[in-house]
Every structure is written in structure tokens, then in C-alpha cells.
Amino acid sequence: MTLIHPTAVIDPKAELDSGVKVGAYTVIGPNVQIGANTEIGPHAVINGHTSIGENNRIFQFASLGEIPQDKKYRDEPTKLIIGNGNTIREFTTFNLGTVTGIGETRIGDDNWIMAYCHLAHDCVIGNHTIFANNASLAGHVTIGDYVVLGGYTLVFQFCRIGDYAMTAFAAGVHKDVPPYFMASGYRAEPAGLNSEGMRRNGFTAEQISAVKDVYKTLYHRGIPFEEAKADILRRAETQAELAVFRDFFAQSARGIIR
């Protein structure tokens, strides 16, 4: 059963599936689709060509699907796509994509996005991430699965943060953060391996050791980057936990933190 507060303003063209709950004074635009059993708190605003999956929980004053903060945007029908089982807390802002990017902003499944976080246009967020309060992404940022962003983390446009990586409080990410690694500092630098996150997600001691050796190869052995990368890619052919480095290196446009 869909439950809509009488003060909510929902365009007749919006599509709400069964079990959706909408709180007081929330506004939902005409091109919005909301999946089953998603709960939307009071005073939220959902606009644009926005698709939201099932079993999400969206808190009060969230702003989803507004136009991107890009002066080149000319009201093109770009999109915001949100998956299933996400928690989206108070005062978060997720913008539509742009035609100069991929045309959509995408959020996967089971993400925990805390208050005041900002996801700019054309960002792609994986699954099972945690964004602590006030983490902000510029446009075209890619965040992998199981990433943890510390509070007030700022990520520069076009940066990538690999699977299972973690940033410290107020990290300023200006280059790509490889999978499994931690980053900290105003101009983020390598800060070790996210070994605790790996353990919590079922990695064995042997797998963690293999990734730790990758970290040492990149940062502690004095090897030129291209030589270190070639060595890591060779190892990735036989070690499954290192396979993520193949795609990461291939798709990196800004270079990695050093």
C-alpha cells in the first residue's frame, strides 16, 4: 500500500510503485520513478528524470535530481539513477548528469550516504559504500564498491577511487586512489592499506599480504611507476584479488596519488 501525506505535492505523471511512503511537504516531479517500498521523509525534493529503485530510505530535506551545477547545461533530459537499498540522509544533494559527460549520475545498491553529502553531475557510485557527513564529489567522479569516504572528504573532478579504498577525515583527493589503499591529507597522499576493511569483507591473510606487496611495489621500492605497474599487472594474471588493478590502471586519467 502506497502512503502519501496529504501535504505532499506529487505530479500526476510521477510513477510510484507499491509500498512507497512519502512524508509531509515532499515535492516529486513529473519524470520521477520510485520503486517498491522506498520511504521518503518530509520536505524532500525529487525532480528531473530520476529513477529510484526499491527499498531505499530517503530522509528529510534531501534534494535529488536537480539540474547540474554546470554553466553549459541547457535543460537536456539527462538522468539520475539510484539503485536499491540505499540510505540517503538529510540535506544530501544528487544532481543530474550532463550531455558533455555520460548523461546520467548513477548510484548503485546498499550505499550509506550521510547528511550533507554532495554528488555532482555524471558521478558513478558503486555498491556497499559509506560516505560520512559532508563528503563531496565534483563532476565525473567514479567511486568503486565498498569504498569508505571520511567526513568532509573532497574529491576533484574526474578522479577515481578504487574498490575497498578508504579516505581519512577531510582528505582532498586530487588524483586517483587505487583499490584497497587509504588516503589522507589536504592533498591526499597514500596512507597505507585498508587491511581492516579487507578483513571485514572476508579477505584472507594471504590475499591481504598480496595487496600489501602491491602497495610496497608502488610506494616503497623506488621503482618507476610504469615498471611497478607492469609488475602488478603480471601478478594480477594469477592472483584474483589483484585483478581490479587491471581495470583501475586502464581507466585512470588523472594518475594515482603519490
Curated annotation (Swiss-Prot):
Pfam families to which the protein is assigned, alphabetical: Acetyltransf_11, Hexapep
Gene3D superfamilies tied to this protein: Hexapeptide repeat proteins (2.160.10.10), Udp N-acetylglucosamine O-acyltransferase, C-terminal domain (1.20.1180.10)
Keyword list, A-Z: Acyltransferase, Cytoplasm, Lipid A biosynthesis, Lipid biosynthesis, Lipid metabolism, Repeat, Transferase
Example of a GO MF term: acyl-[acyl-carrier-protein]-UDP-N-acetylglucosamine O-acyltransferase activity
Main enzyme class: transferase
Record-listed E.C. numbers: 2.3.1.129
Name recorded for this polypeptide: Acyl-[acyl-carrier-protein]--UDP-N-acetylglucosamine O-acyltransferase
Gene: lpxA
